[in-house]
């Protein structure tokens, strides 16, 4: 790759965000191109986020070219030890399934999986109605759905208010959500970005939702973003779920308590939720603490309004849902990278799953989803119980997907 002068703006973009890629034109000269999707940015350091943004994308650089470009962008002196370390990092990313292959889109979730997700992992309509009632969502309510996947929840909320934004890291999911919204005649603002970086004006949203994704995210960064973006009196919902199938279930070896993907947390679901509630509550308490002077724009709303504007845990609600865990659910749950991480190949794996499900009765395929809704509110007083295990659960319906 020939030396190239990078503009200050392009250099800062590449340093600040992994959502830009250094691509190669037909004559071999590099240029800053459109957004790419570095799925691994959840856990990568800034150094490797830059590297990943250089290395991925449909017209991304080769490994050696990415290393050369990295040294130019960081103004670092090329060193053999560092070059080897960077190449090793790329090899590790590929073997871990983070990078599918050089010059390919790095998304784990393609259009097929997005459709399976919408059809076989729909967000429960009963829970959507609960959120609408709890937050008083109406036509004028501004809603942000964080890490919202292909829009399972956001699309339902868009039927209540036209002011719904979906923020999602997977490009495949963003495209699927936009297509579904267009097909349904719905207004949906889809943003291709990580929920770890809420780059919005103060108090922009009345309601923020985060469903089944907090475990993927940096919760400190998420809470910092919420203290900035949540409007006065606004609601932040963290929705957690846990699936439970009998050991005799045909797919217990994949989604059971002890499976090829690893063992599940043995604690009761209520205690897992209680631990999460406590952690998030302490984070909000620290981030909204008054009388601590910092040059942090995230503090502006809380500091100006005082204690009444703090984000506090207002309520917790539990729900139960009986539903089938079948071939469709498995396809919506497992990517090819998940499968290969177990040492199996997707083709034989899916053939076995299909055979097991075909031989089972509908009753044998059933299991239970436990749901919890943690409701945080800006302003007011804390209202969650001391012991979550004493909370009852409300039964909600499973609505079979239509073909």
Task: List the predicted regions and their residue ranges.
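Long, charge-rich, low-complexity alpha-helical segments
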Residues: 40-105
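Conserved class I S-adenosyl-L-methionine
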Residues: 102-138, 140-147
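Class I SAM-dependent methyltransferase SAM/SAH-binding core
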Residues: 150-197
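A short acidic, Gly/Pro-enriched loop at the edge of an enzyme's catalytic core
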Residues: 199-208
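A short glycine-rich, Lys/Arg-flanked "PGG" loop and its adjoining helix->strand segment in the class I
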Residues: 221-232
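Conserved catalytic/acceptor-binding region of the Class I
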Residues: 235-320
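Conserved Class I S-adenosyl-L-methionine
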Residues: 291-401
């Amino acid at each position: 790759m020939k030396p190239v002068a990078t503009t200050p703006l392009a250099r800062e973009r590449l340093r600040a965000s992994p959502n830009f890629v250094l691509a190669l034109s037909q004559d071999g000269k590099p240029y800053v191109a459109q957004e790419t999707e570095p799925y691994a940015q959840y856990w990568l350091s800034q150094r490797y986020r830059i590297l990943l943004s250089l290395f991925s994308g449909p017209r991304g650089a080769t490994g050696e070219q990415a290393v050369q470009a990295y040294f130019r962008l960081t103004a670092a002196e090329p060193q053999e030890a560092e070059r080897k370390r960077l190449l090793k990092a790329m090899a590790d990313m590929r073997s871990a399934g983070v990078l599918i292959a050089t010059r390919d889109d790095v998304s784990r979730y393609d259009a097929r999986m997005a459709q399976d997700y919408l059809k076989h992992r729909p967000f429960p309509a009963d829970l959507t109605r609960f959120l609408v009632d709890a937050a008083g969502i109406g036509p004028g309510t501004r809603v942000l759905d964080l890490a919202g996947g292909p829009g399972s929840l956001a699309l339902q909320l868009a039927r209540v208010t036209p002011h719904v934004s979906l923020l999602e890291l997977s490009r495949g999911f963003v495209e699927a959500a936009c297509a579904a919204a267009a097909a349904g005649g719905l207004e949906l603002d889809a943003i291709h970005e990580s929920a770890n970086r809420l780059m919005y004006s103060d108090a922009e949203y009345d309601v923020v939702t985060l469903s089944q994704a907090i475990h993927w995210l940096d919760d400190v960064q998420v809470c910092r973003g919420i203290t900035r973006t949540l409007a006065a009196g606004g609601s932040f919902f963290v929705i957690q779920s846990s699936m439970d199938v009998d050991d005799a279930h045909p797919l217990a070896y994949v989604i059971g308590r002890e499976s090829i993907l690893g063992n599940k947390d043995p604690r009761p679901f209520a205690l897992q939720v209680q631990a999460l509630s406590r952690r998030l509550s302490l984070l909000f308490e620290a981030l909204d603490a008054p009388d601590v002077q910092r040059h942090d724009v995230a503090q502006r709303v809380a500091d100006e309004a005082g204690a009444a504007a703090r984000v506090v845990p207002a309520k917790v609600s539990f729900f139960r849902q009986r539903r089938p865990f079948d071939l469709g659910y498995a396809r919506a749950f497992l990517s090819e990278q998940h499968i290969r991480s177990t040492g199996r190949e997707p083709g034989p794996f899916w053939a076995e799953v299909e055979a097991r499900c075909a031989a089972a009765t509908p009753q044998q395929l059933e299991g239970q989803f436990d749901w919890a809704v943690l409701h945080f509110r800006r302003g007011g007083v804390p209202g969650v119980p001391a012991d979550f295990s004493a909370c009852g659960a409300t039964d909600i319906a499973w609505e079979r997907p239509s073909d």
